[in-house]
Design a protein with these regions (language model features):
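Hydrophobic alpha-helical context, especially transmembrane and signal-peptide helices
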Residues: 4-6, 42
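Bacterial N-terminal signal peptides
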Residues: 7-16
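Sequence/structural signature of beta-propeller domains
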Residues: 21-294
Length: 294
């Protein structure tokens, strides 16, 4: 049953969403009290970071990717912002990559990348790519990829936020909507196969979240808390007393924390110390953890 979730309603002074104006603002604000341990993602490869995931092969490493316009490629960085590796997905087209997530199945580190952007809501289906996480300290070509073609049950949707829920083995997708009426969907991870094959699935809609312009989501791998991010705030939904029910969890009143004033935050990931890390679009973009003590 679809549940209407009234977690929070944000009221805007105008109907125009004002996005952070320049990369110089990122650098000026990167040392504000809103974020800690801020570094810059150095190099010319990443100029529109749209997804972020903590490596489960090396917890000192991060994976990210560009938005549309790049090759089907991931980049690995250390906590100093230096690139340590990259990964090319063979035979995959990057139409509009918007998010990624890391997780483990039976001790095997995995990554999922979502080609799910659809600003005009015209795509008949989207793609999720699941594969074993490569070494973040090397350059790797990946050809064993589980390709999941996903159709929404209620028509085309623009989505920029996905996560993996370790307890249910579901991939979580949350719609990006200008209105605070974002659809919440899940896709069950297919069983592992020695030879991955393309599959087609219909996502299950499990609820509606009253937060507009959602750009990122991640699930704490240890306690199951869900972090939802839009351009201005982060929302932490505690898993306590929800019995692993995603809709019930996202129906709770969240803790709300203002984001740093960076150019355009579209990527977030939770580490194993329950810290939420963020990055922004733009060349030499900041990477830092949200200050949870404010």
């Amino acid at each position: 049953m679809i549940r209407s979730i009234f977690a929070i309603t944000l009221v805007f002074a105008s109907s125009t969403l004002v996005v952070r104006s320049s990369l110089s603002d990122d650098k000026k604000n990167s040392k504000s009290d809103a974020a800690k341990d801020v570094v810059e993602l150095k190099g010319s490869d990443v100029n529109e970071s749209s997804g972020l995931a903590v490596s489960n092969r090396d917890e000192r490493r991060w994976w990210t990717h560009n938005d549309s316009g790049d090759k089907s490629r991931l980049y690995a960085f250390n906590h100093n912002g230096k690139r340590t590796g990259k990964c090319d997905l063979e035979g995959i087209k990057a139409k509009d990559w918007e998010d990624m997530a890391s997780f483990q199945i039976d001790g095997q580190p995995k990554l999922v990348v979502a080609d799910c952007g659809d600003n005009l809501a015209k795509r008949k289906s989207i793609w999720l790519y699941v594969f074993d996480e490569p070494d973040p300290n090397k350059s790797t070509d990946v050809d064993r990829i589980q390709k999941i073609q996903v159709t929404y049950p209620d028509g085309s949707r623009n989505c920029e936020a996905i996560a993996f829920d370790q307890s249910s083995k579901n991939i979580l997708l949350i719609e990006k909507s200008t209105l605070p009426l974002a659809g919440i969907y899940t896709v069950t991870l297919p069983p592992a196969s020695p030879r991955p094959v393309d599959i087609e699935v219909v996502a299950e809609r499990v609820g509606t979240l009253n937060i507009p312009m959602i750009t990122a989501v991640d699930v704490d791998p240890l306690n199951g808390d869900i972090w939802v991010v839009n351009y201005f705030q982060a929302f932490r939904f505690s898993r306590a007393e929800t019995k692993n029910d995603l809709a019930a969890q996202l129906g709770k009143l969240p803790k709300v924390i203002d984001l740093p004033k960076w150019k355009q935050i579209e990527a977030a990931a939770v580490d194993r110390e329950h810290q939420l890390w963020l990055t922004s679009e733009g060349k030499d973009a900041p990477l830092g953890r949200l200050n949870l003590d404010r």
